[in-house]
């Protein structure tokens, strides 16, 4: 069992919570700077741990909200930062609209590797109350989120995130600045929701994207033919693979075939 102690508080590291604590203050300063946080923002920090990032945010504004699942760490943060609102629980079940109130949220966090995708999709679902999110995560996932067409990392995650948010890879973080040290490097990205939703049916678009990438090396024609009536679509784009399409091309194709879904089709099959 790995234990970490800080300011007379010791915890047994829980792998299922993805607990790797950042120790380099230069990096926390850089994260806060990149987030463009200002004193008037409604700020939410995901998983403060021992408060490395919390400390930097509090130099800008002493009052904000943090969500911490580990009871011992939640207690530690309450004692160290009495002006904060500490929500002890799972971020995935938290009501973000209640936290935001009348102002959009600026979210920061060193998020657990194991639940990175659920966190990202929760933020995506709540994008209308999101000002920005500046997040540290596994380096490989950061590359997948910010990937460009015709690259090996460009896939479902890139298209779904970039369709509704401006995403940016900010900087890499080596594994040696964490306790305990993870087996991979991390990276920090930013995501800012687009002003207007490019498609009205996000769930339908999501199904379409998953179907388009179902077998990565196959053409769109082959991946989509069981789900949509493609004989009614005149588009040379169907001869391409999903990884070759830009986000705008995904939008245009979706608008063409959206009404043509086969009623009995299962997009995941």
UniProtKB/Swiss-Prot annotation:
Subcellular location as annotated: Cytoplasm
Q: Which residues bind S-adenosyl-L-methionine?
A: 20, 22, 47, 68, 90, 110
Q: Does the keyword Acyltransferase apply?
A: no
Would the keyword Nucleus be found if you checked this record's keyword annotation?
Answer: no
Q: What name does the UniProt record give this protein?
A: Ribosomal RNA small subunit methyltransferase A
Ranges in coiled-coil conformation: none
Q: What is stated as this protein's family in its record?
A: Belongs to the class I-like SAM-binding methyltransferase superfamily. rRNA adenine N(6)-methyltransferase family. RsmA subfamily.
Keywords (A to Z) from UniProt: Cytoplasm, Methyltransferase, RNA-binding, rRNA processing, S-adenosyl-L-methionine, Transferase
Q: What does this protein do?
A: Specifically dimethylates two adjacent adenosines (A1518 and A1519) in the loop of a conserved hairpin near the 3'-end of 16S rRNA in the 30S particle. May play a critical role in biogenesis of 30S subunits.
Name a Pfam family for this protein: RrnaAD
GO molecular function annotations of the record: 16S rRNA (adenine(1518)-N(6)/adenine(1519)-N(6))-dimethyltransferase activity; RNA binding
The protein's Enzyme Commission number: 2.1.1.182
Lineage per the UniProt record: Bacteria, Pseudomonadati, Chlorobiota, Chlorobiia, Chlorobiales
> Where does this chain mainly localize?
cytoplasm
The entry's cellular-component GO terms read: cytosol
